[in-house]
UniProtKB/Swiss-Prot annotation:
BP-aspect Gene Ontology terms: DNA-templated transcription
InterPro entries: Seed_Dev/Stress_Resp_Reg, TGA_domain
Null mutant phenotype: No germination phenotype.
PROSITE patterns according to UniProt: DOG1
Signal peptide: none
GO molecular function: sequence-specific DNA binding
Organism expressing this protein natively: Arabidopsis thaliana (Mouse-ear cress)
DOG1 domain span: 10-246
Pfam families (UniProt xref): DOG1
Top-rank taxon, per record: Eukaryota
Protein name (database record): Protein DOG1-like 2
Xref: PANTHER family: DOG1 DOMAIN-CONTAINING PROTEIN, PROTEIN DOG1-LIKE 2-RELATED
Spans through the membrane: none
Length: 255
């Protein structure tokens, strides 16, 4: 792909990311309001959760479409901070981290401060108990544990396939790489096409994991989970920008 074409695609990908981040901020406001005003209205909570999950599905679809035009940018995005890029798995977070966040919200003493921070709604309204996730039943926990194991297995499969793609490129003769042989370009094109497929699979796994989680938990627990996840993501991005400034780097603009 020509440099100008690749740059144009990257601009579209970056715009897609910033639009998603703006929507994330709106989601947080909506989730806060739901916890303050609608916590006893399951229908309203379900509608909000469904909308947010659908918004993520739409975003993942846009990412997939753009990745087939040039997927390499998603594996070290210029719009991310360096610390965020160091934590990426297949262009995003590990789906299994969604479930680990739930475990952190369940109320163990080791995670109490984190839970209280992530669930803080505003300066005048806090959830001071362990959070609604602390009310998870044994049946819910069992289903989440089964999902966790299933997701880890699928993550490992995607990771292994990615490693195989890298090995295929590494096996190219060094002389061919130096002289930019046509076979090398074909191999790199094949590599990027394969990685675009894997990125789509990873995004699908992220979406399916999110959807299955909200099916297991109550509407109120789903709102709590989504709020904590989005606050954690934004906090990591902000912290990454601070660290980038201290190190003299350039952090991405605010997901």
């Amino acid at each position: 792909m020509e440099r100008s074409s690749s740059y144009g695609v990257e601009k579209l990908q970056k715009r897609c990311y910033h639009e998603w981040m703006s929507l994330q901020t709106k989601h947080i406001d909506d989730l806060k309001e739901a916890l303050m005003c609608q916590r006893n209205n399951d229908d309203k909570l379900e509608d909000l959760v469904g909308k947010i999950v659908n918004d993520y599905h739409t975003y993942a679809g846009k990412r997939s479409e753009l990745s087939y035009r040039c997927c390499a940018h998603y594996f070290a995005p210029s719009w991310n901070t360096p610390i965020e890029n160091s934590m990426l798995w297949m262009g995003g977070c590990r789906p299994s981290s969604f479930i680990r966040l739930i475990y952190a919200l369940c109320g163990s003493q080791a995670e109490t401060q984190l839970s209280q921070y992530l669930l803080k709604i505003d300066d005048d309204f806090d959830i001071n108990h362990g959070g609604f996730m602390s009310d998870l039943t044994a049946t819910q926990l069992g289903k989440l544990n089964d999902l966790h194991l299933e997701v880890i297995k699928k993550e490992d499969k995607i990771t292994k396939t990615s490693a195989n793609f890298q090995d295929d490129v590494a096996d190219l003769p060094i002389a061919d790489v130096v002289h930019a042989d046509v076979a090398v370009e074909d191999a790199l094109d094949k590599h990027e096409e394969g990685m675009a497929v894997l990125l789509a699979e990873a995004d699908k796994l992220r979406f399916e994991t999110l959807r299955k989680i909200v099916d297991v938990v109550t509407p109120l627990q789903a709102v709590e989970f989504l709020l904590a996840g989005k606050r954690l993501q934004l906090s990591l991005h902000d912290r990454g920008r601070v660290r980038a400034d201290v190190c003299g780097g350039v952090g991405g603009a605010a997901v």
